[in-house]
Amino acid sequence: MSRRREVPKREVIPDARYNDKLVAKFMNCLMVDGKKSLAERVFYGAFDLIEQRTKEDPIKVFKEAVDNVRPTLEVRSRRVGGANYQVPVEVRPVRRQTLAIRWLIGYARSRGEKTMRERLAAELIEASQGRGATIKKRDDTHRMAEANKVFAHYRW
């Protein structure tokens, strides 16, 4: 355990177009090698595509997608008497959001569409409709926690 003082969490500055902290956080996670302007171009381009395809407010689709993907339970490894148990634990709110963002970006990157903005738009639309790879990941995480419910008494 570190003896240094705890580093304070930095406040995320809301993005310019939508004035939303969740959007800014998503763009920061989307950013690679510090290229924020590229991340913004990809993200806002994806929002334009979402608006064209769904004829809905893209911020609404985005928030719905993030809400749908948020996991409530996950498993953590716990070593007890030489055996590793997968112990189901509730996910803290900040981690829920972080996991949702990470999964959305990860599965968008692994899609087959040509450009990243198309991939991101498609993944966000699917997640907002309750389908797609990201939703499957959330369901698998919940299923894993459900299957290991017998080890819940090892929670710490």
From Swiss-Prot:
Gene3D superfamilies: Ribosomal protein S7 domain. Keywords: Ribonucleoprotein, Ribosomal protein, RNA-binding, rRNA-binding, tRNA-binding. One of its GO terms (biological process) is translation. It comes from the Bacteria. Part of the 30S ribosomal subunit. Contacts proteins S9 and S11. Belongs to the universal ribosomal protein uS7 family. This is Small ribosomal subunit protein uS7. It comes from Magnetococcus marinus (strain ATCC BAA-1437 / JCM 17883 / MC-1).
